[in-house]
Amino acid sequence: MGSTTSSQKFIARNRAPRVQIEYDVELYGAEKKVQLPFVMGVMADLAGKPAEPQAAVADRKFLEIDVDNFDARLKAMKPRVAFNVPNVLTGEGNLSLDITFESMDDFSPAAVARKVDSLNKLLEARTQLANLLTYMDGKTGAEEMIMKAIKDPALLQALASAPKPKDDEPQA
């Protein structure tokens, strides 16, 4: 089964729905089973703190939401949070957060960190350190060279001010 075919649609095609409401009716002396469709509507304010005011409840329409259109519906809804949290990074003041979500992936800790400037810098540093660790794995003497560069401020400054290699230039 490909990624475009969901398992929920497979179940819907191959198995009867779980909720079946049926009752026996007597029509003109004959008993007949009648099935009632089960339709459920949920009303919820999922936008959090919307940037623009929402329509009145009476003016809102029901939307069909399924696995295929969930991210599009979420993006159209523009769920948003805005609040202040204590700044535990520097220990001074509060951080003002204002985050708008567009897909389910935006709720992951890394995606939230990318939307907060001070956390994004830490996340980038963590990613670069993880890349460095992967690069150094199995290279003899690499750890000693890194420790030597960290302990020698003059060497560290020279390495930081050295021109970076250009990856854009075509090689002959």
Swiss-Prot record:
Gene knockout outcome: Deletion mutant shows a clear reduction in E. coli killing.
Organism domain of life: Bacteria
Stored InterPro entries: T6SS_TssB1
NCBIfam families for this protein: VI_chp_5 (TIGR03358)
Subunit structure and binding partners: Forms a heterodimer with TssC1. Heterodimers assemble to form the sheath of the T6SS machinery. Interacts with TagJ. Interacts with TssA1.
Function per UniProt: Core component of the H1 type VI (H1-T6SS) secretion system that plays a role in the release of toxins targeting both eukaryotic and prokaryotic species. Forms the sheath of the structure by assembling into tubules together with TssC1 resulting in the stacking of cogwheel-like structures showing predominantly a 12-fold symmetry. The sheath contracts to provide the energy needed for effector delivery.
Protein name, entry field: Type VI secretion system sheath protein TssB1
Organism of provenance: Pseudomonas aeruginosa (strain ATCC 15692 / DSM 22644 / CIP 104116 / JCM 14847 / LMG 12228 / 1C / PRS 101 / PAO1)
Lineage, opening ranks: Bacteria, Pseudomonadati, Pseudomonadota, Gammaproteobacteria, Pseudomonadales
